[in-house]
């Protein structure tokens, strides 16, 4: 038989060879496992599960700092700005790598990137644990941040590209579920080691096991067929896809799936990066909607509630590292409980409705928490303890007065009177206008009245009666925070990703999500690294009330600007968003509907007559 004829002949003989015709060239492919036999289902599940360990690591690393920070600020005598740098270092690393991570993904592939980021996580964790210093901790957390940011993108792409089309939604949901499970694990281990000397080392080291497991197993799994096609490795792509689809009945033929991948890749090549910032098809408006959505998502306070959970709880009455960390562990439980129903409700209710309901719950819970923090007098409480504002060796009796100079070295003042009521000053915080005092009574931290500073940078401090946080306010604060977390988990947590994947056309979706992801990390970094400073300046209640106000703005934004995606195809959504008058039409939609009902157009009358 002539070579040209042989190159297009297809045969069902298992011992023969398959030849797939490409529009431009004829590619010779060796026969791989039959799509009708084999265990492709198990291979897909294994590949997705190992890749989604990245979600577990992301959730774990984001949540563990809440409890570990209580120990670290004592071990390393961290000041308020230094605590913010420890928290923000992970976010800074994530932001930096999100800017250029796409190049690594496209050049080296999803599988290699996942392996690389797992090893990077191991390196950052070992640096944080083995070298006990502030800068080693910051650099180690930056490396971990780079790891979780890039691996999160790589694992989602890998899972979507190796799974059959009918499974892709569930595979992405598996990643989201792994994130919240990682958060639960992070909170749980933080509590377990809260009372152990150097327990923060064990908490940080908990990331080593899943990272090493992922780095060890991932090389044994197949690469993404889409990446192989992008690298012009069609023979390998065909063989890999045959392995992944072997034995799965509800999938299209491998050749058809390869053809669909080529068409999608061709559509992506039609759009450049700069197209995102042009008015064609309202692309710039779509980008602004996505950016505003993720900004408001972070501005509702979610990063700070997550990272500073134990710190906030200790200020509202949960004294002691163990108590505050145990209370924050409930956040992980609630996150899991809120994410699971969201997965099942999104197709029935729609993401827009879930966003509105969840954000309203967040708004009410933060308003309640803000009122409680004012009643419990946490508005004069310092959330920071550093080397420059602690005088643990100074003992006073209630009613005593003494002169305390600014920048007093630790232990300068010795006990002036024999301790009678077991009351002693534990911290002094200079806010430029007032001294904010905390003191301990029978191992329970209580708040003191503020005293104005004199022009000579000294103050007459009159020790006042104890102000205990009542048990009822303490537990209402915890419930308010748990309700806030539940509202976030059923709405902003998973639904923002659903909306972002729907408002951009297929050809430019990857570029758009990358830009918004970088903006998301930058916003997260800004909010997390200013939380303690803001609470010192304006007070915790004011900060909490600002979160409630941002939640209200977010509800209005979702109602006005976020399109309804329930029961609509991506093509329908994109067509509507591409209309030049979409923004104006959205703002006036209710007025137009009313007008259309009252006065039908001539075309509608003609159609009705027909």
Curated annotation (Swiss-Prot):
InterPro entries: MFS_dom, MFS_sugar_transport-like, MFS_Sugar_Transporter, MFS_trans_sf, Sugar/inositol_transpt, Sugar_transporter_CS. One of its GO terms (cellular component) is plasma membrane. Disruption phenotype: Morpholino knockdown of the protein impairs the development of the embryonic heart resulting in abnormal valve formation. Embryos also show poor glycemic control. It catalyses: D-glucose(out) = D-glucose(in). Residues 71-84, 140-141, 198-201, 308-325, 375-475, 533-542 are extracellular. PROSITE patterns: MFS (PS50850), SUGAR_TRANSPORT_1 (PS00216). Its main location: membrane. One of its GO terms (molecular function) is D-glucose transmembrane transporter activity. The chain crosses the membrane at residues 50-70, 85-105, 119-139, 142-162, 177-197, 202-222, 287-307, 326-346, 354-374, 476-496, 512-532, 543-563. One of its GO terms (biological process) is heart valve morphogenesis. It is found in: Cell membrane; Endomembrane system; Cytoplasm, Perinuclear region. Keywords: Cell membrane, Cytoplasm, Glycoprotein, Membrane, Sugar transport, Transmembrane, Transmembrane helix, Transport. It is a multi-pass membrane protein. Insulin-regulated facilitative glucose transporter. This is Solute carrier family 2, facilitated glucose transporter member 12. It comes from Danio rerio (Zebrafish). The gene is slc2a12.
